Amino acid sequence: MKVVSALTAVERLLEQGRVRPGDTLLDSSSGIYAYALALACHKYGLGCHIVGSTTIDSTLYNQLVLLGCRLEQVELSADLKLDQSLRVRRVRQLLAENPHYHWMRQYHDDIHCLGYRPIADRIRAELGGEALTIVGGVGSGASTGALARYLRDAGTDVGLVGVQPFGSITFGAEHVSDSEMIIAGIGSSIPFGNVEHTAYDTLHWISFDTALSASTDLLRRHAVFAGLSSGAAYLAARWERHVRSSGPVLFIAADTGHRYNEAVFSRAESARDIAELAPHSAVDTTELTMPWSRMRWDRAEAPPNARSEEEREAMPVKWSR
């Protein structure tokens, strides 16, 4: 999924002259954005420097290295917020040492939204402008937020449903912890500037074990080998289809299942029948509870902890057209 985002962002930077062939692009990522940025840099003759964690598996590691990416892996700590902060600190050190580097800032620069315009156009063309519901992991906010924004700007009635892991600060669930792990890519322990909270109508919070069951079902039932974030979105989309009276429900499958082979698919025997699962209905974030909660967000503003000091001082999120 991130390929369209990273590739279009790099193309725009080159068009604007903000980077030139031979320059180095830098960011923090331990997943599919790292791979997407490495592909874009490889295509356009740019250097790629990624600060990731030790959770990067051997398959991704080998791909990044062979694509010419310089990869630094920061050791994990017991605290996810500290992990993310350490990686950002290392990025800032690298920028100080290499002022000619360009920091992509995938979580804060809305240039990453541009690549989703053609996808929004395709959705609108295939559905003929019919009202629809989009379901997907929130993460950096670029994919779900941009698709909804571009479709709404074109006159399509879009209900936007975001999917989050427990423990994520983005929509105020940092007080509920998942004993297994936070699902990579769809939540965060630090604020993200690209998340436009007022775009979302409904939120689902889904635990690791529940997403495991959904990812397993997605493969068994539909032959789609996708990751945990895709499984979580699939589960939420099934529920939204159940409670909504009309209109198609489209969900975003962000990544393949390869990196989850050991953590998820080798544990398929522990998967529950998702037909037996239903979300707890929460009125506000104080009522969130494991393993699955659903709440109306009604396009409300960001919760207090989801905006950093840097964010509050910066300009509001602006969407590139």
Regions found by a protein language model. Give the residues of each.
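Helix-rich "cap/lid" substructures immediately adjacent to catalytic or cofactor-binding pockets
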Residues: 1-23
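Alpha-helix C-terminal capping segments
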Residues: 11-18, 35-47, 65-66, 148-154, ...
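A short, small-residue-rich loop immediately preceding and capping a beta-strand
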Residues: 20-53, 131-144
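Buried hydrophobic positions in well-ordered alpha/beta secondary-structure cores of metabolic enzymes
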Residues: 31, 41, 64, 104, ...
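Small/polar-residue-rich loop-to-helix segments that shape phosphate-bearing ligand pockets
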Residues: 54-133, 165-212, 296-297
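Active-site/ligand-binding loops adjacent to catalytic centers
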Residues: 88, 153-228, 264-321
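Glycine-rich ThDP/TPP pyrophosphate-binding loop and its adjacent helix/strand module
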Residues: 115-159
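Catalytic phosphate/nucleotide-handling subdomain of diverse soluble enzymes
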Residues: 238-274, 281
